[in-house]
């Protein structure tokens, strides 16, 4: 059983360690983030996304690749070299495994594309004319084609970054899809997601590839869509998307699971709930505890540094307890009255189990 971050950290207090706005400042921030993760017992460790909190720089660099369909090499090479350089710096600061998180192609493909108008918006704009409605439908089809092209181009650009990280020795690469909850039952969207992730992952050798579903529940897309590509593990946010438990239950037992259960909010989940989530995930598909980890439910960038450190400590402590055999220490750490069947059934204490 292990614990890891599935999102970013707030900026640690730096003091006079480095001048603001310099490369030295970013290096110092990353080191402080790594030391805090080590102290909390987390592994694999991340750079806390302190260099590129929302993947904005990486998205811009890869946008050059996706811009006109010709996949120019300059933006892709820069994305690869800067990402590898950042991972190598973080990995050189600790003897623990360091993973690299990347944005997913489906989410990137939605950037900069206007969302379809609602029916009421169309009615107001088009005043009910048949020709106007047909024009809007054509625009939506063109928008969908453009987004599909961009998504696949982003998948190609990300594939280059993944291969560069693999060549550098990165042991674990996490692909985060924030918009997978928007797929639903749309067959075209499901196909686009599957095609993009196959383009990104098939034939990659070396690192452990993990798909992270954040921002909501992607269960509506179906396990056949989310689990189609050959990822070695699946991470899910169970606070923003409790129905992601259905994906956990349908994930084959030879794949790992990271359950995101410690959210970036004021109230902490009881330790007993975290242990319940870890052991339930371990029970699905005959998976066992060695293929299960506890994770943050999203990131902690919205918190104070002190609060984020407390959340990481909670994660690390829960993973340590979840790995324990029955013992006096474990018994002392748990409150048997913290979960009632009635409260759990109402969803007050535990993440909802999967529907059958």
What do the PLM-derived regions correspond to, one by one?
Residues 1-356:
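Domain-level signal for soluble alpha/beta catalytic cores
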């Amino acid at each position: 059983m292990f614990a890891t971050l599935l999102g970013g950290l707030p900026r640690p207090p730096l003091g006079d360690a480095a001048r603001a706005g310099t490369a030295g400042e970013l290096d110092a921030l990353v080191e402080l983030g790594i030391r805090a993760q080590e102290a909390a017992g987390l592994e694999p460790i991340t750079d806390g996304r302190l260099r590129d909190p929302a993947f904005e720089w990486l998205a811009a660099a890869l946008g050059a690749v996706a811009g006109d369909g010709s996949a120019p090499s300059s933006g892709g090479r820069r994305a690869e070299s800067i990402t590898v350089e950042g991972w190598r710096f973080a990995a050189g600061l600790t003897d623990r495994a360091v993973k690299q998180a990347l944005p997913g192609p489906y989410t990137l493909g939605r950037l900069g594309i206007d969302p379809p108008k609602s029916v009421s918006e169309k009615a107001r704009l088009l005043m009910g004319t048949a020709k106007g409605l047909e024009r809007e439908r054509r625009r939506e089809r063109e928008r969908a084609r453009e987004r599909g092209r961009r998504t696949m181009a982003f998948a190609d650009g990300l594939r280059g970054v993944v291969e560069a990280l693999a060549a550098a020795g990165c042991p674990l690469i996490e692909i985060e899809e924030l918009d997978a909850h928007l797929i639903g039952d749309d067959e075209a969207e499901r196909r686009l997601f599957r095609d993009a992730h196959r383009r990104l992952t098939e034939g990659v050798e070396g690192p452990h590839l993990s798909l992270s579903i954040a921002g909501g529940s992607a269960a509506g897309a179906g396990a056949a869509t989310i689990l189609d590509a050959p990822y070695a593990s699946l991470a899910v946010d169970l606070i923003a998307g409790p129905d992601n438990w259905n994906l956990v239950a349908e994930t084959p037992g030879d794949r790992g699971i990271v359950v995101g259960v410690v959210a970036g909010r004021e109230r902490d989940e009881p330790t007993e709930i975290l242990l319940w989530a870890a052991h339930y995930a371990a029970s699905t598909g005959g998976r066992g505890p060695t293929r299960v980890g506890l994770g943050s439910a999203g990131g902690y960038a919205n918190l104070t540094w002190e609060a984020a450190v407390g959340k990481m400590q909670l994660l690390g402590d829960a993973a340590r307890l979840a790995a324990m055999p029955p013992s006096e220490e474990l018994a002392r750490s748990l409150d048997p009255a913290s979960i009632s069947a009635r409260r759990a059934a109402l969803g007050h204490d535990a993440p909802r189990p999967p529907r059958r």
